[in-house]
Amino acid sequence: MIGVISTAYFTMKDKHSIKTVKKYWWKNCVIQHVKYHGKTFIIATVGYGKANAAMTITYLLEKYPGLQTILNVDLALSTNDKHDTGDTTISTKFIYRDADLTVFKDIKYGQIVNEPESFQFDGEFAKVVKDFKLGLTEGVTGTADMLIYNSKQFKEMVDKYGHTIDVIDTEAGAIAQVAKKSSINYIALKIIYNNALSPWDNDPIHKFKMYETVNTLKYLLRRLFNLLSSNYIIDLSQCSQDDLDSINELFEIKHDQWIKLFKPNTHKVLSGFGPSLMLVDKQEKTPVALDIIQVIRSKTKEAEGPSKVILGEDEWKNAPKKWLRKLLFLEQVRVNDDELLWNKSAKYDLNNEKLYKIETVETVANEIAAAIAEKCQDKSSYTYNGATVPEKYLLVNCDARISFYITHNQSHEFVEDKNFGTQLVSNEFLKYLNEALKDVDSPYQQIVIYMTIPALDYRKISVFIPSNKGANRGVKFVALNQKLQRDYTVVDITRNDYDPIKVGSFKVTIRLKSE
């Protein structure tokens, strides 16, 4: 059981293995019980300030004796010039910025009598979260029932402490004090809204910064909850950013099930041993190596992105450039100023601009095949604990930028079932993949292609195409369904010779939804 304390109110949508079991008010707090892939999270939305925070954690610990871990996830200000809007810090050290009891002997500024100078948490849980590699930077959090508004206040704080505090907030330190006395795990994850010394009045990109930080909060929580609820021991600390994007997307869509495609009895998911991931059983006797490659990964150009449409040319110059990847990850819903802390993602009008160049199924399949053929040239093996790993697998992740109809040749009926539609997409790719790879020998025990296709009625369609098992032989994907090939025809909607009323069916689109 894990507790989450935040001043931001957010909800989890019930779907698959995610369910809000209970929600109720206590004092001025909203308490939610969320069952997330089998693990229980207690989410508490609190008022601002140290007293509210201390009261809430005390209540949670008394109400739920099994609660041994607390996370404080929230927005904050930074006094560190290295932090930008949307950056996320992890804090394991906390101090008070407004405690001055130095009149007592040996008491330093920020210290409470009979309490340590700071509250530090360096246990196993902090390492677990750091190993998730969520893009966190470490920093000291200073808590007070006041913010810093000018350079004079900042200088006074530095003079009193002798060093700079990285993050300032109004809750984390109070939670840390109670957590320390209660001997539980505790860390704080803070999404930076702004530098504390930057002017707040008439900030031309204030709304953008609020969208950015609130969306980053949602983005962080989804990835964090996915990994914390996993049954595996996970260390992604040595993964590349491309690998991390693929891994986190797979945990989002399939949770632990995607790992079982390669090794059902996996106990540890580890990086830093040569392949993208090493999948290790509990006895560490039969590890499996997993290479991950990306095909057609979208890149954000400096002058592109939906934020430019909203902000305009001048304001865009000062806006962060990492927005598009986050926006595409999130569910698009409209938000107004009153709803920001309800954790809803911003939705933008792109004026029908295309985010991607549309590709045909054949073109995408050939690009995937070319990447597989190149990777299969590497016949080397990996080692784990001094022994050669006998099996290695290949996962190919592709952002399939395709747009088409699939129509029944006789009835022209719509294909509305998601699973059947996915099967039809897979079937169409198979004929091109097998033809392109017929002369390629693979050193991999199995190759699995994972594609995500933006769809009209679904936020994202997942397509998994596994090859036949067996290393050191030709690449052959699961048998093509000839009947489906006879009964259905793919109609490329980039052409102008189709009639959507006549062809009907399963439509895939590359445009963001608009209301």
UniProtKB/Swiss-Prot annotation:
PANTHER family named among the record's database cross-references: 5'-METHYLTHIOADENOSINE/S-ADENOSYLHOMOCYSTEINE NUCLEOSIDASE, 5'-METHYLTHIOADENOSINE_S-ADENOSYLHOMOCYSTEINE NUCLEOSIDASE
Region described as Helical 4: 426-440
Pfam families: PNP_UDP_1
Protein's organism: Spiroplasma citri
Keyword Cytoplasm assigned: yes
Localization per record: Cytoplasm, Cytoskeleton
Location of the region described as Helical 2 in the Swiss-Prot/TrEMBL record: 206-228
Protein name: Fibril protein
Role description: Acts as a cytoskeletal structure involved in the shape and motility of spiroplasmas.
Principal localisation: cytoplasm
Modified residues (Blocked amino end (Met)): M1
Gene3D superfamilies found in the cross-reference section: Nucleoside phosphorylase domain
MF GO annotations: adenosylhomocysteine nucleosidase activity; methylthioadenosine nucleosidase activity
GO BP field: L-methionine salvage from S-adenosylmethionine; nucleoside metabolic process
Keywords annotated in UniProt: Cytoplasm, Cytoskeleton
Cellular component GO terms held in the UniProt record: cytoskeleton; cytosol
Region ranges (Helical 3): 357-376
Coiled coil, from the record: none
Helical 1: region residues: 21-34
Superkingdom of this protein's organism: Bacteria
